[in-house]
Amino acid sequence: MNLKVILTPINLKGEEEPNCVERITIMPCILIDTEICLNVRCRSPFAKFKVLIIVDGFDSAYIQATFCSISDSVTIVNKSNEKHVTFDGFVRPDDEGTTMPYVIGPLYSVDAAVADRKVKDVVDSIQNQQTMLKVFINEANVYNKWNMLKGLIYNNNNESVLVK
């Protein structure tokens, strides 16, 4: 199974810069409880990246991938005969048929309690904050009418239980 992460930079005007896209492909050796951390260095404290995640190269007929951030989550199941799942953002609250692009950036706010600290300490605390996106990938059990009927008629060895 492959986990592809595509980061598209967004400039200060809000425009995507497709010529500076970063592509990362991860092929986890052990799929059980694998934790992967990507650190992205930005060229500016105002830089942002649009995130696209593709899960492909799996053997199962159906998989479900759940993407969780601090405030949102979404689960995606691949269609039949399709061997990839694509995450491009979370569901838009006012229109569930579209997604909002998932954008990350290094510009974070700092609590007022740290106002008496040195500038270097404040900058370090801003740079050390992380955007967490958790991805859970499992085999999905998808049942349609034919599979349910087949389960009633045939046993596990594909022998008919009606013709004994």
Swiss-Prot record:
Please tell me whether the keyword Hydrolase is annotated for this protein.
no
Task: Please state the protein's primary subcellular location.
Answer: host cell
* Classification of source organism: Viruses, Viruses incertae sedis, Naldaviricetes, Lefavirales, Baculoviridae
Q: Which gene encodes it?
A: DA18
Q: What does this protein do?
A: This protein is required for viral late gene expression.
What is the top-level taxon of the source organism?
Viruses
Enumerate the UniProt keywords alphabetically.
Early protein, Host cytoplasm
InterPro entries of this UniProt entry? AcMNPV_Da18
**In which compartments does the protein localize?**
Host cytoplasm
User: What cystine linkages occur within this chain?
Assistant: none
Q: What is this protein called?
A: Early 18.5 kDa protein
What Pfam families does the annotation carry? AcMNPV_Orf17
Q: Name one GO cellular component term.
A: host cell cytoplasm
